[in-house]
C-alpha cells in the first residue's frame, strides 16, 4: 500500500469522519495516516503524498504553517493556493472580479471601524470556520470592538 499523510491538528475529535476516509483510502490501496502538521517527529519525506485536511489550528501560527507547507515534500495542496486562501482578504479579489460576496469591510488591529445599523458579524481574516467569530446586533457596536 502507498503511504499518504493526511495533515491534521492535534486533539480529540478533530476528524470525526476519519474512519470513513481511512476505509475509502484503503479500498484504493492507500495507507492513509493522520499526521499532526506541526509535529516535528513526522518524517514527511517518507510519504508519497501529503494532503492538508484538518489543520484548523494554523490560525494561531499562520507564518509557521506557511513555512511548514513550503517545506513539505510531495504536498498535494499547492503552496500559492494555501498562502492565498488562509487569509480572508481573497474575498476582496473575488468581489473585484465580479463575484458576489457578503458585504465585507476589512479592518486592521487597532482600527475603530464603523459598524452597520443592522445585524453584523466580526471575524478574523485568518480564521477557520467560525473560530473567533461572533454576531452582533445594531445596538452592540461597543461590544464588537
Residue ranges and their predicted role:
Residues 1-76, 81, 89:
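ATP-binding N-terminal substructure of ATP-dependent carboxylate-amine bond-forming enzymes
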Amino acid at each position: 500500500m502507498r503511504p499518504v499523510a493526511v495533515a491534521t491538528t492535534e486533539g480529540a475529535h478533530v476528524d470525526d469522519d476519519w474512519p470513513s476516509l481511512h476505509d475509502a483510502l484503503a479500498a484504493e490501496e492507500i495507507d492513509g495516516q493522520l499526521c499532526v502538521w506541526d509535529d516535528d517527529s513526522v518524517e514527511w519525506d517518507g510519504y508519497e503524498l501529503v494532503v492538508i485536511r484538518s489543520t484548523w489550528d494554523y490560525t494561531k501560527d499562520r507564518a509557521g504553517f506557511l513555512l511548514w507547507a513550503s517545506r513539505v515534500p510531495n504536498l498535494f495542496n499547492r503552496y500559492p493556493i494555501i498562502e492565498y486562501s488562509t487569509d480572508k482578504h481573497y474575498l476582496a479579489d473575488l468581489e473585484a472580479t465580479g463575484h458576489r460576496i457578503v458585504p465585507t469591510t476589512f479592518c486592521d488591529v487597532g482600527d475603530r471601524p464603523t459598524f452597520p445599523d443592522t445585524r453584523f458579524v466580526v471575524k478574523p481574516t485568518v480564521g477557520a470556520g467560525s473560530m473567533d467569530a461572533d454576531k452582533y446586533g445594531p445596538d452592540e457596536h461597543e461590544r464588537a470592538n
